[in-house]
Design a protein with these regions (language model features):
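C-terminal helical cap(s) of enzyme catalytic domains, especially alpha/beta-barrels
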Residues: 96, 110-147
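Alpha/beta enzyme core
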Residues: 1-77, 82-105, 124, 132-137
Length: 147
């Protein structure tokens, strides 16, 4: 859909959500040829918030703290492409420490060697501020317990 159609749809569903007390998640989409700059993400998250989204899902990028500082609603990061477990934990840690409210990871949890252990390690990083290295060690220990 075009950007204009997307904004109309967003506005429609935000109004419906408000009517029924349902929070709306705004998602910053990037196509293959769209830029992934701090400026783009800051503008897109701000636009979604000003349209009335209650929480925003976007990608982690350089200068992420500028994006979270400029956005008046909570931001969660998308997990993006599958990366090694230590990298996913590090990205989650940096994002939360730069202002993200949390993470929304799919393939970095579901495609991990042990998804349940990875989910617990991500929780440790996001909710307990455990450093990525310690969370990865916990992941390795939890993997042994599952097997």
């Amino acid at each position: 859909a075009s950007e204009i159609a997307s904004l109309h749809n967003l506005s429609y569903y935000i109004n419906k959500g408000e009517r029924y007390g349902i929070p709306v998640l705004g998602v910053v989409a990037v196509g293959k040829e769209m830029e992934r700059t701090t400026r783009y993400f800051a503008l897109a998250t701000r636009l979604l918030a000003e349209q009335g989204a209650h929480i925003i899902k976007t990608y982690y990028c350089e200068n992420f703290e500028q994006i979270t500082a400029a956005c008046p609603v909570p931001i969660v990061i998308a997990g993006g492409k599958k990366v090694p477990e230590p990298e996913a934990l590090d990205m989650a840690y940096r994002a939360v420490n730069e202002g993200a409210a949390g993470v929304d990871m799919g393939r970095n949890v579901l495609q991990a060697e042990c998804p349940s252990a990875m989910l617990q390690a991500i929780r440790m990083v996001v909710h307990e501020n455990v450093k990525p290295e310690a969370a990865y060690k916990a992941y390795q220990t939890l993997m042994k317990d599952v097997k």
